[in-house]
Amino acid sequence: RETFNDKILKKKFIFEYCTTSKINVFRGFHFQTKNKQSKFVNVLKGKILDIVIDLRKKSRTFGKVFKIILSKKNALGLHIPAGFAHGYYSFEKENIIYYKLDNYYNPKYESGIIFNDRTLKIKWPSKNMIVSSKDQNLITINQFKKKIKYL
């Protein structure tokens, strides 16, 4: 574990947790404006479409979306650098997602990008996604550019 963190990711993860999601649930796209978090995500049970948006200052890929399927079956993990918004869609009846983070969650600095922002051009696997009211009221990428500018 220490070798992976120190040599490959060059990160000190200080916090770990699991979360669960049911089928057709989307959570995201979340980030913190201060106390930014680098994350490592993998799936202990089920299958998710994991999606990140680059919000880093002066990044050549600012505003670009990256998607990957993570599942118990494929045993892949995803390192998400600080400065990215993160979200995922759950494909199966029961999904358990495992996180490692290099900074603690602070609700004072939480924000996010709304899932259905057309400028992101995301093709969703379902038209019947379940999205929390909190996540339905996040800002667009254009509002982010005006209000927050970058991470």
Where are these regions (language model features)?
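Non-catalytic, conserved peripheral segments adjacent to functional cores
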Residues: 1-76, 94, 99-151
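Beta-rich strand-turn-strand
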Residues: 70-79, 84-89
